[in-house]
Amino acid sequence: MLFENGKFKIEYIEECIDHDANRSFIFTVDIKDFDTPTLNLVYDLEEDIIVKTYIDEQFENIPKSHVVYKMFSLIEYEVIEIIRFMIDHM
């Protein structure tokens, strides 16, 4: 499943079920108009929070990798709303 607007692109990757039976989902977020790596995130449905954000190892040390975290903090609420919508309509 894919969501795309003028600012970013969110792609559903997979669902994970951990040992506590919590449902969590892995998504990627690609912020447009900036040359930054794609941010991966894990969203916990039961807690309604993003529990983890990370960049693939191959991109960790490029000059703009730290910028993606700061930029994501500016759009995090909007991304969570879209993720909830995507999960509800799967």
Name each model-derived stretch.
Residues I49-M90:
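Acidic, low-complexity intrinsically disordered segments
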Residues M1-E46:
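Amphipathic, interaction-prone secondary-structure segments
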